[in-house]
Design a protein with these regions (language model features):
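Transmembrane signal-anchor hairpin modules in multi-pass inner-membrane enzymes, especially those
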Residues: 1-62, 67, 93-98, 149-158, ...
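Aromatic-anchored transmembrane helix interface
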Residues: 19-27, 42-58, 65-90, 101-112, ...
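Hydrophobic, aromatic-rich transmembrane alpha-helices
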Residues: 22-36, 141-153, 326-346
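Alpha-helical transmembrane segments of multi-pass inner-membrane proteins
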Residues: 83, 87-124, 131-196, 222-223
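Transmembrane alpha-helices of multi-pass inner-membrane enzymes
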Residues: 146, 338, 353-404
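A membrane-periplasm/extracellular boundary helix in multi-pass inner-membrane enzymes
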Residues: 168, 172-173, 193-249, 267
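Long extracytoplasmic/lumenal interhelical loops at the membrane interface
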Residues: 252-256, 263, 271, 275-324
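Hydrophobic transmembrane alpha-helices and their immediate junctions
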Residues: 309-311, 322-363
């Protein structure tokens, strides 16, 4: 229910989601489980860094004389991220398999979101050009995680073609990042299957070696992407980005063209690296600099003005640093590190179903923390991170005996 309601906006001081309001309403009923979850060292470390991030945001807002409205929006975003995380920790501390219900809810929410967008924004040209991102990925990605959980152990050859098809179709219909993370997960699934069948189930070094192999295999996939993007088969946006690249075979240049907001984020961080610019910062000189850089890249096709009321950063990691200072950056670097660590521990100790969900999450987490806006941090990350923590805690019990 909560995961499904995360797509329904409620406008108060800022934009809440109905799911967040339900979390706050249910807190008293789950307080006992939440307090129990706080005994977990992983939870305490994340909460401690979250409090440090919140404190840094308060200091940043005071230093930058941020308006009360914007300060409440920025502080509220951090507060809701952490309270939602703690709620799901309480929900999963007894049984991490409860996460399957959350995934079902997230998939249902994706269907609901697609229906609402089509009903009220069906004529929006931007949505039509990016069908996958706006109408499909919201329900398809959690559905893929559920499918992997159910079938990877017993029928892995069903998971492989589905993941490859997902990646190809997503790229064809504008979901390049979503297709990429699922292709990486699928490559890892193939590697993991060979490891399980040829190493008697010993997966101790599989995370490190698997990621290295995936990185190598991504090279020919990137070359194929360039060829098809240049031909126009992957849509206008992909073709324009490839055509603008001085060297289309340079993946860093192509990535920066797709996520050009990172450039202005680095300028903003350079100006105020310790405390940042404050909640919902929107400095006029940085906006003008961003538009100037866009004209240098896109020429006449560059935007003439910015309609957002916040500096366009498009990165959870860099955004936390730009608006809240260095402590926000440290928080999300720690999250990425623990995601790899906890996923690796699941590979060693967990059941194959739980491992499958972790494999889906690793590239998903990394991509969205690095290259997606703050919505990921508030609406998707809390439930997923809580799952990784308590799936590990479940299989680390003395009497736990995972069935591969």
């Amino acid at each position: 229910m909560i995961a499904a309601c995360m797509v329904i906006p409620v406008n108060l001081i800022g934009t809440f989601r109905l799911g967040e309001l339900l979390v706050l309403a249910l807190y008293p009923f789950y307080m006992k489980q939440i307090l129990k979850a706080l005994r977990n060292r992983e939870v305490m470390a994340i909460v401690g860094l979250g409090l440090l991030w919140l404190t840094s945001q308060v200091l940043s807002d005071l230093y930058n004389a941020t308006t009360m409205k914007n300060s409440l929006r920025g502080l509220g975003s951090i507060f809701l991220t952490m309270t939602t995380f703690l709620f799901f920790c309480g929900l999963y501390c007894r049984n991490p398999r409860n996460h399957l219900g959350t995934l079902l809810g997230a998939s249902a929410g994706g269907v609901l979101s697609a229906g609402l967008l089509y009903r009220f924004e069906g004529n929006n040209a931007g949505y039509a050009e990016n069908i996958w991102d706006f109408y499909v990925s919201g329900w398809a990605h959690p559905a893929f995680a559920i499918f992997a959980f159910l079938f990877y152990r017993s029928h892995p050859w069903l998971v492989f073609p589905l993941g490859i098809a997902y990646g190809i179709v997503a790229n064809m219909y504008g979901g390049r990042s979503d297709g990429l993370v699922v292709l990486i997960s699928t490559l890892f699934f193939v590697y993991l299957w060979f490891q399980v069948t040829h190493s008697r189930g010993d997966l101790r070094y599989s995370m490190r070696s698997g990621l290295m192999i995936c990185a190598v295999l991504l090279v020919p996939l990137f070359l194929l992407y360039v060829v098809y993007a240049q031909s126009g088969a992957l849509g206008k946006a992909a073709k324009m980005q490839i055509d603008l690249a001085k060297n289309p075979y340079n993946p860093v240049e192509v990535l920066l063209l797709a996520r050009n907001e990172s450039v202005i984020a680095l300028d903003a961080i350079y100006e105020k690296p310790i405390l940042g610019h404050g909640s919902w910062a929107n400095p006029g000189h940085l906006r003008r600099l961003y538009l100037l850089k866009m004209r240098e890249i896109y020429g006449a096709a560059a935007p003439k003005k910015l309609i957002q009321d916040i500096l366009p950063v498009h990165s959870v990691l860099l955004g936390a640093w730009v608006f809240g200072g260095l402590a926000g950056f440290i928080f999300w670097v720690y999250v990425i590190y623990r995601t790899f660590y906890l996923s690796n521990q699941l590979l060693i100790n967990g059941s194959m179903g739980m491992i499958a969900i972790a494999v889906v999450y690793v590239p998903y987490f990394c991509w969205h923390v690095l290259f997606s806006p703050n919505a990921f941090a508030r609406f998707s990350w809390p439930m997923s991170m809580a799952f990784l923590i308590f799936a590990n805690a479940f299989f680390m019990r003395p009497n736990a005996a995972p069935k591969r």
